[in-house]
């Protein structure tokens, strides 16, 4: 971020501080492969793995595809002061109810509690090689 800001032509940045990270986009409908497709019904379904983790799946029937999201949301609410005023922040809401979205906003800006027991900080501290 510091290196890019010193270069001409580098635009504004935003930091994702909350949201479920897409893990996979399928090229076919998960329900269609089981014979239970509901056309034009962009509903959310849940995949459960062998460790009993639930992965939300958003169906996009128009394109016969799905987006599989991480079982826990990314949340950098504990480090929000690091980014305040340095860049724009973004909170992505995908499967949250209205009440959950309000609770998340309060956790970020009013020091409330997240509506989830578990979350990930992704690669925020570790980086990627």
Regions found by a protein language model. Give the residues of each.
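Active-site pocket-lining/capping segments in soluble small-molecule metabolic enzymes
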Residues: 1-129
